Amino acid sequence: LEAVDKQFHFLFRHKIDTAEELTSYRDDASQRITIISEERKELKNELRRIGIPEQRLEEIKTRIGQISAELRTLRQDVKLCDAIAVRSLEIAEKNAQLKQIEEKEVERKREQERKHGKTHIR
């Protein structure tokens, strides 16, 4: 239930109403992960250089921390998008199964009515 609650709040917070919007959000988040991961990699490489001024070192470390926090959030968002997509497919399958069961029940009732209707006519 907690997972469903998180998914609901995620969809609400990001104003996602359709599967297409969910896919678009996920793709954007994945692309952002790629971009800022590369930025973080470059900053970490810069940290290894000798003779960097102390102020620049602090700026780099601060930015790496910011990127790491953003990456954590984006990765969680991507996981949520994947979980929501799976859940929506499961719900769609269950709805299809339910509809099939209901249709069979309606057909069974019609068949019974036809049988009973024929016996009354004789």
Feature map (PLM): residue ranges:
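Extended intrinsically disordered terminal tails
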Residues: 1-122
